[in-house]
Amino acid sequence: MQIPALIELTEREAIPRSLILLTGNTNVGKSLYCRQFLADRLKDDSECVYINCTSTEEHLLEWLDGIGVARTPGLHFINPYMRKQSGGGDSSVKLSNVLTEIKNAISNPRKSAIGNEGLQKKRGDDHGLQNTEKKDLTLIVDSLNHLIALFGKAAVEAFITDIYFTSKMQRLSGICALTTPSLSKDELDVLNQSFDALLEMAYKDDIDLQLRNMKMVMIRGMAITPRWVDFELEEDGTIKVLKKGSEFTCYVCK
């Protein structure tokens, strides 16, 4: 499995298929990392389910176009908030419905009509018969905080637990972002049990918030040495890993 900045974070060229929990402060770069994670997996021809409560499919596709990632029927976009709104706040719109769709995507790659807009269904009609080979499925959730706000902690915990066990039986991997601090230590410890790897982002300097870094805290079944890796956010919405002491742009001096 490949992830953005893998070599810098782990000194490995690949890691086992994993579900990763990405934690960090507000606006530290978690959403950009998730989108870059998505772009990289699409380039690898993975089926991808992208869950985001604050964006639209059109906005996501425009961003992918802007960084040169081709549109594909393997991308499934879900905005749970839009679904609840379109249902008039209907309580029957539950997180379990999303889970069912994800499992359908695993069972029927590139033939499942997943998404908030009709574009995905049209793509599936046009291309579904051309490629029914089962591929890896990547799940990106940005963010768990928004899902908790919509569905409650218990529902989200059950959702992630089910995803975790599904990943052990199917070709499923992915990443879920969580803004911290937002859960108690005990709640976070329980959530951590449903992930194979923990990735942390932080501001490097409390004064200059342009300075950011990240580290892979652990990967189950693999010995790694956690190390902080500096990065900055690019204007095109991607993440650039910095070499120590050489590439960082001083925004104060500009």
Model regions: which residues?
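Pre-Walker A adenine-sensing motif
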Residues: M1-E13
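NTP-binding/hydrolysis catalytic cores, primarily Walker-type P-loop NTPases
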Residues: E232-K254
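Conserved P-loop
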Residues: N27-S92
